[in-house]
């Protein structure tokens, strides 16, 4: 298991609506390699978040009025922080997971001639999706400037809603939508 923080945007490709992961940080190296194979632009980061407490007073409960927090750091810089307060149950976790993902798999060639080894546009959807408890609520989100990250370039313009949910998804393959023909050697 690992923690991740990601920014997903909606996009269209060849007339179809997709979700695209613009930024994603994970806290384990193995998650970076798998994600890059899938086309996610994963980077290593430090992610901290409140976990629900089911007994005792060691954290917030999954009930109206409880507040959860999360932070993202990378390269010894705070990049983002968030706070979510449960307002009530939700039927679903919004539209973030409602569309298939669209990714760009790109790897430069080992030569320094400007050629690429891989350049593809791919899509994928999970299977065996299981959604657990889901809550909607109020949230606050703040991004911070960094000399090496560009997260502030996608600052929110409109707040739609906040969600907290449990989800399990499996993945095994995707579909290549476009592949740039690479030069022969």
What are the residue ranges of the model-derived segments?
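Glycine-rich, compositionally biased intrinsically disordered regions
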Residues: 1-36
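Interaction-surface and assembly-scaffold signal
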Residues: 40-185
């Amino acid at each position: 298991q690992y923690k991740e923080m990601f920014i997903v945007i909606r996009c269209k490709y060849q007339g179809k609506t997709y979700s695209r992961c613009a930024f994603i940080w994970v806290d384990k190296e193995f998650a970076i390699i798998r994600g890059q194979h899938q086309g996610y632009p994963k980077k290593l980061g430090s992610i901290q978040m409140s976990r629900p407490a089911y007994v005792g007073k060691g954290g917030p409960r999954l009930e109206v009025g409880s507040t959860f927090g999360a932070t993202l750091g990378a390269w010894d810089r705070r990049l983002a922080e968030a706070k979510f307060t449960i307002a009530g149950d939700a039927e679903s976790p919004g539209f973030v997971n409602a569309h298939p993902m669209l990714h760009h798999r790109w790897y430069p060639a080992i030569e320094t001639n400007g050629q690429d080894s891989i350049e593809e546009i791919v899509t994928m959807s999970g299977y065996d999706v299981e959604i657990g408890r889901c809550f909607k609520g109020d949230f606050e989100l703040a991004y911070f400037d960094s000399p090496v990250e560009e997260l502030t370039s996608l600052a929110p313009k409109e707040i739609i809603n906040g969600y907290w949910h449990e989800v399990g998804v499996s993945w095994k393959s995707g579909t290549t939508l476009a592949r740039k023909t690479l030069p022969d050697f």
